[in-house]
A protein has these predicted regions:
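Donor-sugar nucleotide-binding helix/loop cap in glycosyltransferases
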Residues: 247-441
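Nuclease-adjacent, charged terminal/linker segments that flank catalytic cores
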Residues: 1-108, 112
Length: 441
């Protein structure tokens, strides 16, 4: 069954709220607007109308005017041009390998399909103990709770605001902690996700941090973000250098962990090439989706639920165009198929090939993905050129490989224009780079 979302109802909701309450006009005048859950409820369930975990999730009105929204009580929200989101730092680190205890049979690496399971596995396998470097680590608080009362400043449109009159006051707002682990030296507050994303809502770390910083007296509180994707655990620890400044967070450290063998050699790929058979170009748009990690991630999300495109747009950090590009890229590779559900909505499901990936070990899955990519001639020719010259071919060379492969626009049956092929060449280069990095990891 396809999981359906209402086609950007969130956009309609906020257009109506703005029309009724002159939200943007008020913000332009005094810098903020306070709105209640009761006022929002006239047009949409408040919980759904204010949930923007990533910058791209915000409604059109917010995107156009640079707005963000934060809860300040159990039933009130603060809308302004606060810089509410933080971009994940682009850092690559060596993978640390650990092994779960042999006696654990109820959870294994092939069954991690939720944030809670990822957290449990990170705990029992020793990932958290290694990352936090604390003794006698034990799970403590989790779930929804009320915040303490506190005030903070935040950057607005790139400017640091410290004027006392500009402080935002929070009192008894609902917060949610995915998990907390307390050791001898500190308390770690965890925020966990299964979708790869460029940014996150600082509030998810800041509000729990402020609340538990007040409760813990002298014991340090450590905000930690955990992302689990494609068998890799990504951990980011942050600190707030100024307790009262929302945007003062700084990355303390970042590590990657895996519980499986991830070593893939050139010889492994050569074995693939010896038996490789080329696929015909499918009647689907040639990929324009540069992050192959996100192609994998969107397949992971579909493995949990068949979904409609707008659900991916709203539930995860994909905007509307990104959803189309990444779903089409997965369809191009034969990992995803599109059909109509009973209500006439486009529904996306994994193919048998797509489903089979997630019963494989990490190494088997990566090799199968490499084989799938290289079975399309433009990618194979680009990979071979890289292998022979030890450098990525130029964009012009990759365009020539796309033409050699006979790639055409499925809508017209004609070759893509040079400008379009140059954009597609970026994706070819990025995916081949992913293969090279996978081998070198």
């Amino acid at each position: 069954m396809c999981k359906i979302s209402k086609a950007r109802k969130i956009d309609e909701t906020w257009e109506k709220l703005n029309k009724k309450y002159n939200i943007v006009k008020t913000i332009n005048s005094i810098g903020y607007y306070k709105i209640s859950a009761d006022e929002i409820k006239e047009f949409q369930e408040p919980r759904l109308a204010v949930k923007f975990d990533h910058a791209d999730d915000r409604p059109k009105l917010f995107m156009e005017h640079g707005l963000s929204i934060l809860p300040i009580t159990r039933g009130d929200y603060y809308i302004s041009r606060i810089k509410a989101y933080h971009n994940f730092e682009s850092i690559s680190s060596d993978i640390t390998y650990l092994t779960p205890p042999e006696h654990i049979k109820s959870l294994d690496v092939t069954s991690i399909n939720s944030e809670s399971k990822a957290l449990n596995m990170a705990y029992i396998s020793g990932i958290l103990a290694d990352f936090l470097e604390d003794e006698n680590l034990l799970p403590t608080v989790s779930g929804r709770m009320s915040s303490e009362s506190f005030a903070f400043y935040a950057n607005v449109v790139g400017e640091a605001v410290t004027d006392e009159d500009s402080a935002v006051t929070v009192e008894n707002s609902q917060i949610e902690i995915d998990a907390a682990y307390e050791g001898v030296k500190s308390l770690a507050l965890m925020e966990a996700k299964r979708d790869l994303t460029d940014n996150f809502l600082i509030r998810q770390l800041y509000y729990p941090f402020r609340t538990w910083h007040q409760k813990m007296a002298k014991k340090p509180v450590r905000p930690v973000f955990l992302i689990y994707s494609n068998s890799i655990f990504y951990l980011y620890e942050y600190r707030f250098n100024d307790l009262q400044h929302y945007n003062s967070l700084e990355l303390v450290k970042h590590k990657r962990y895996c519980l499986e063998d991830t070593h893939i050699s050139v010889e492994d790929v050569q074995k693939i090439l010896k038996k490789l058979r080329f696929n015909k170009e499918p009647k689907i748009q040639f990929p324009q989706a540069n992050s192959f990690e996100r192609v994998i991630n969107i397949c992971e999300l579909l493995y949990i639920n068949d979904v409609e495109k707008n659900f991916i747009t709203e539930e995860y950090s994909f905007d509307v165009r990104q959803s189309s590009y990444y779903l089409d890229a997965a369809r191009y590779l034969g990992l995803v198929e599109k059909s109509l559900d009973l209500d006439g909505h486009d529904c996306y499901t994994l193919t048998q090939l797509g489903k089979s990936l997630f019963s494989m070990s990490y190494k088997q899955r990566q090799l199968k993905l490499i084989e799938t990519i290289l079975s399309y001639k433009s990618f194979y020719l680009t990979y071979e050129a890289y292998r022979n010259n030890n450098e990525m071919p130029s964009k012009a060379e990759i365009v020539s490989y796309i033409r050699q492969a006979g790639v055409v626009d499925p809508k017209t049956g004609l070759p893509y224009s040079d400008s379009t092929n140059k954009r597609r060449a970026s994706t070819v280069s990025a995916w081949v780079r992913w293969i090279i990095n996978t081998i070198n990891n």
